[in-house]
Amino acid sequence: MTLIARFKVDSFEPRQVAGLEADWVGVLTFEKTFTAGIIGQAATLFMSAGTEEGARSYVATERITGRTEDGADGSVTVQHGGLESDPGTWFGHIVPGTGTGAFKGWSGSARIRHDDEGAYFEINLT
């Protein structure tokens, strides 16, 4: 089953990490609202490296809590990332064992994609 979960970023906050005072890496926390596919919120820890377009990377872990359009309630943790290069490399996975409620037992991939309507997760449940 494929779930398209559209979201918008509500806020992001740069974070300081002790011992990691460098301009080559950035750490942020995000708050997101999911508006379709899953209705709910997510809290995200995001780390990026690189500043030049075509030479950046990121990795993020986020906890999504909400309800699917068919009424299933729960939470699940997703880890995703990518390397902006030619060609780009992107990944995303549901972290095994992190589902609660109706999301318990969820496994599969979860990649961020973009279209004319904005950003969304393409979640492929296995």
What are these language model-derived features?
Residues M1-T126:
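Beta-strand-enriched cores of mature, soluble protein domains
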